[in-house]
């Protein structure tokens, strides 16, 4: 037996010891705890708005904090800011590269960002004096595609990349403040905690990591998925996270218990998950799938309680408004739909 094989076995044994130690701390299962909870019942949501205007696949969307405006990015090379109440386009921003994979709305509403196969994160000022929207910064240091970006405030943004790293940027100087190293596969998705001090990342190494923005360190690593993690989000109280993977499951991990609580899967679901988001209370989990649907799960009982079907292609992105009143889904069919 080679030395590598020996080390591999040793690593597996150590991983098993960690898993056993975690299990020993779990004095009760989530299923036991929530057995007394009332059943959610069928969740039926209708399409209230369809946002038409993109001419190609939509890859990403993100709500503004006002729960009214949202930004979407498409392969047609446009970044569009929409008014979801009227379905009007507030801004249509032509991009230098049409290979866009992510977009983000700043909490202040002053900026939007996007990036993709150009390996850059481009920041656009929506409130410029001239009235036209233009690039205010191009953040380039990643050596792989930009998979996700999220603002912390008007001067700080976190990015994840196909180069396996995440980075915190100072937008004013255009420099990376911190590089977060630890994943062994492409970083696919990130989400920022409600207090903006932590963020989580999901990667193609099938693990999710919790990072401390201020210290620049990895706090926790969560494993259990059998394939790439494509999507990740925080539970509304910031004390748990949910991941969506190509293994056709979503998983809920508790940060304090340091382990997986529940797995959302069904034998009839065999395709990967592209996007995940919680309702305002956290009781419902929305997950977008490659089979053109968005499933609604009871996050406490891991039962499927609804389905949003209306797209003619893969649901690539989704988001719940800050006020919890609506869900938006974006798809490769070039449309965005607003549901409630």
From Swiss-Prot:
WD repeats lie at residues 53-83, 95-125, 141-170, 182-212, 224-254, 268-298, 310-340. Gene3D superfamilies: YVTN repeat-like/Quinoprotein amine dehydrogenase. One of its GO terms (cellular component) is cytoplasm. It holds the Pfam family WD40_Gbeta. SUPFAM superfamilies: WD40 repeat-like. The keyword Repeat applies. GO terms for biological process: cell volume homeostasis; G protein-coupled receptor signaling pathway; regulation of blood pressure; regulation of cholesterol metabolic process; regulation of fat cell differentiation; regulation of gene expression; regulation of glucose metabolic process; regulation of hormone metabolic process. GO terms for molecular function: GTPase activity; GTPase binding; signaling receptor complex adaptor activity; spectrin binding. CDD domains: WD40. Keywords: Congenital stationary night blindness, Disease variant, Repeat, Transducer, WD repeat. G proteins are composed of 3 units, alpha, beta and gamma. Interacts with RASD2. It is linked to Night blindness, congenital stationary, 1H: A form of congenital stationary night blindness, a non-progressive retinal disorder characterized by impaired night vision or in dim light, with good vision only on bright days. CSNB1H patients present with childhood-onset night blindness and middle age-onset photophobia, but have near-normal vision and do not exhibit nystagmus or high myopia. CSNB1H inheritance is autosomal recessive. Guanine nucleotide-binding proteins (G proteins) are involved as a modulator or transducer in various transmembrane signaling systems. The beta and gamma chains are required for the GTPase activity, for replacement of GDP by GTP, and for G protein-effector interaction. Belongs to the WD repeat G protein beta family. This is Guanine nucleotide-binding protein G(I)/G(S)/G(T) subunit beta-3. The lineage of its organism: Eukaryota, Metazoa, Chordata, Craniata, Vertebrata. The gene is GNB3.
